């Protein structure tokens, strides 16, 4: 079952978050310059100051809700995803996977160009129907009750694509943690996931024979 979903964070929760940020005991962090021991304190204070005084969550909430959002249950987890139907007669389906620490917000500026390239100077025949899920434990998806790794997440997302969304054939793209999940989609579920594109090389073939030049480079 697929249910429509609207992002609507209660004002009381936003007030609570801002209150915690304002009351943070900055004296508990040593006054050390640079980033050798973690995030620079001065930078972090500037970031938190922006968060409290300038950041407008409702503006970003509205942006997310400008797309069609849904939730569906796979293996007991309610998975949130954005779906944008592609233009044209037969757009391929593209699964976009974010990383850590990340979210579907990473894709908000590329969903429309991918789904409707003709509106951005491209060819309508290159359109994709875009599926952008929040990974389990991220964003608006449920968190698993016990630890799961990228291979299991790939299994869950493949089930979502073929059983819940009726996509027997799809493509996948991912970066960071999403790249590792993409690798497992291509490795374990190639019957349905026909191709992957990754921008982070997290899995490699076993090392083969190397020549003299390659050995010198190492």
Residue map of PLM features:
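Catalytic cores of eukaryotic secretory-pathway lumenal/extracellular enzymes that build
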Residues: 5, 23-26, 42-218
């Amino acid at each position: 079952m697929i249910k429509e979903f609207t992002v609507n964070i209660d004002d009381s929760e936003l007030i609570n978050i801002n209150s915690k940020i304002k009351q943070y005991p900055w004296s508990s962090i040593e006054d050390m310059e640079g980033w050798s021991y973690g995030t620079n304190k001065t930078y972090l204070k500037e970031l938190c100051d922006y968060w409290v005084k300038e950041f407008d969550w409702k503006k970003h909430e509205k942006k997310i809700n400008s797309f069609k959002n849904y939730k569906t249950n796979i293996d007991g987890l309610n998975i949130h995803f954005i779906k944008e139907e592609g233009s044209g007669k037969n757009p391929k389906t593209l699964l976009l996977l974010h990383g850590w620490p990340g979210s579907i917000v990473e894709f908000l500026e590329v969903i429309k160009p991918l789904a409707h390239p003709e509106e951005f100077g491209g060819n309508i025949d290159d359109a994709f129907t875009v599926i952008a899920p929040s990974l389990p434990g991220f964003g608006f998806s449920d968190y698993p009750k016990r630890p799961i790794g990228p291979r299991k997440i790939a299994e869950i997302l493949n089930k979502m694509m073929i059983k819940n969304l009726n996509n027997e054939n799809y493509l996948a793209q991912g970066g960071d943690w999403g790249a590792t999940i993409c690798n497992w989609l291509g490795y374990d579920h190639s019957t349905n996931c026909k191709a992957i594109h990754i921008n982070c090389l997290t899995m490699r073939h076993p090392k083969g024979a190397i020549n003299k030049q390659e050995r010198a480079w190492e």
